[in-house]
């Protein structure tokens, strides 16, 4: 399928929203499995499906509100993103994050105050979970899109956002309003030649700054963010 946009020219818009398993703190798929084939690892919070235990009932597929558990009709097992846990165990970022040419994906632990995830989620509050109203406490966070300025009927720049804020609230909840204000203010600081820790973090000139997953002991959950 070809990409399509929303809105009317010249203010039409589209953006990409990478989707992966959220490795939720309260995964609905885990609760739905009658044979306890789905489990959450204590050491990093990654949610996995035990392929030996899975009986292919597919209750987990229907339970996940993000539709991120699929059924393998060949193996007759439910499967999902494993967050590349063998790589994480070796201190290497998941393949989707490490190979991203746009340097858009950050990987780290929420409990690591010096890591990128904690700064984006807690310090700057610009990284938000998708559909927080589902109540599963997802551990993948998104920095909302900041698109070019829109135009008014006379073809002049308008203060109206190109992506309707109402739509972003639908995706990321009410916290997106303040996140957009913060992002806009920090972008203006950077344009004016002033320092901005947030913009430097998101620009990620050093790719290693995207990842901070080694030598961290946690018990609740890992986190990922995409900008």
Predicted regions and their residues:
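Iron-sulfur cluster-binding cysteine motifs and their immediate structural context
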Residues: 1, 26-53, 58-76, 92-114, ...
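Short Fe-S-cluster ligation motifs
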Residues: 1-20, 58-69, 87-95, 123-147
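Extracytoplasmic Gram-positive cell-surface binding/anchoring modules and repeats
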Residues: 22-24
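Short strand-loop junctions, especially beta-strand C-caps/beta-turns
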Residues: 52, 84-86
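Membrane-embedded catalytic interface detector for glycan/lipid assembly enzymes
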Residues: 79-82
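Long, compositionally biased charged/polar accessory segments in the mid-to-C-terminal portions
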Residues: 95-227
């Amino acid at each position: 399928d070809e990409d399509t946009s929303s809105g009317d020219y010249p203010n039409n818009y589209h953006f990409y929203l990478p989707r992966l398993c959220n490795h939720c703190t309260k995964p609905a798929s885990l609760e739905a499995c009658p044979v306890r084939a789905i489990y959450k690892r204590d050491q990093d919070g990654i949610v996995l499906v035990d392929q030996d235990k899975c009986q292919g009932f597919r209750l987990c597929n229907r339970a996940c509100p993000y539709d991120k558990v699929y059924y393998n009709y060949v193996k007759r097992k439910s499967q999902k993103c494993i967050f590349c846990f063998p790589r994480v165990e070796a201190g290497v970022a998941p393949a989707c994050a490490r190979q991203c040419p746009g340097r858009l994906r950050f990987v780290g632990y929420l409990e690591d105050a010096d890591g990128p995830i904690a700064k984006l989620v807690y310090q700057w509050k610009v990284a938000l979970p998708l559909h927080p109203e589902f109540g599963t406490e997802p551990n993948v966070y998104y920095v909302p899109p900041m698109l070019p300025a829109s135009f008014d009927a006379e073809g002049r720049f308008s203060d109206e956002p190109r992506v309707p804020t109402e739509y972003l609230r639908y995706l990321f909840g009410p916290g997106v309003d303040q996140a957009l204000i913060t992002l806009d203010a920090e972008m203006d600081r950077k344009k004016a030649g002033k320092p901005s820790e947030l913009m430097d973090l998101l620009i990620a000139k050093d790719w290693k700054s995207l990842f901070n997953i080694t030598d961290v002991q946690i018990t609740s959950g890992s986190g990922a963010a995409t900008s």
